[in-house]
Amino acid sequence: MNKPDLTVSDYLKWVNESHYVEGLFEKDTMYQDHVYFRGQASVSWELLPSLFRDSERIHDENMMLEMANNMLWTELNDCRSDLEKMIRLQHYGLHTRLLDITYNPLVALFFACQTPSKPDDDKDGVVYCGYKEGANTKTSYTIAEYVFNHNVFDINQTAFENICKKNNVTQEDCGTIHLITPPLNNPRISAQNGAFIMSPLIKKDVDSHFYIATQADIKKELKTAFMKRYIIPENSKSSIIEELDYLGFNKATIFVDITQKLQYINEKEDKKTMWKIDLNG
C-alpha cells in the first residue's frame, strides 16, 4: 500500500516542532529570528557552497570574481562593497563560497520540491533547518566583509595579525562560518526572504600560526549548522508545488526575472489545456 502524499500542513508541523526541540527554542523569544532553512531538490547533494564542490576550483575564487567584475561592471556599479558584489554574482550563477538560506520555511520547501538537474541524482528532496545561537547578523556581516576583502594567501603572518587588530577582528573570526543577512536592495533576495551562510577562507597548506579552515573543517561546521532535516519524497513534490502555488509561492513570486514569470504563465496554461483534454476524453 502506497503511503499518502505529504502535504504542506505536514511540513509546517515539522517546522513548528523544529523551533522548540531539545530546549534550544523558547516560545516568543527573539531567537526565532535566527532559525533558517535551506531546500535542496535532491537529498543526495552535499550541503556545500558551489565553490567548494570542486576542490580544484577553490583557489580560483579571486580570479573568477575579478573576471566577473570586469565583464559585468555596469550591473555591479551600484553595489556598495565587494561582498555585495559577490552576493549579486551568486544569484547570477557564479560559483562562490556563499550558501543560500532563507528565513521563510515555505520558500525552502519550494526549492526542495524542484526536479534535480541530473538524472542520476536522488529524486527525493530535503529541507534543512538550522539555528545560529546568539547570532548577531550585523556583526557577522561586518566580519564577512572583512574576511572577503583580505586574501591571506598574499600576506604573511605578521601582516595578517596587524590587519585583524586594526579591524577589531580575530583570526578565529576568519576561520568560521558566518550568517549574513544582506541589505534588501536585491529584489530576488527580498522576494525569497533570503540570507547566506558564508564559509571562511581556505589555506591550501595550513600554517599552524594561521587560524584558517580546511575544506574538511567547513564540511563539518556546515553539518552542525543545520540540526534538522525533512525529506520530501519524489511522489509528494507535484502536489506540494500545487499547494504552494495556491498559497502564493511559485516561480512568479519567488523569482523576479521575467523569464521565470513567463515560464510560470506557460505552465499554468499547459495545465489548463491538459485539464480540458481530460474532461473531454
Name these PLM-found stretches:
Residues M1-G281:
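Catalytic-core elements of nucleic-acid end-processing and repair enzymes
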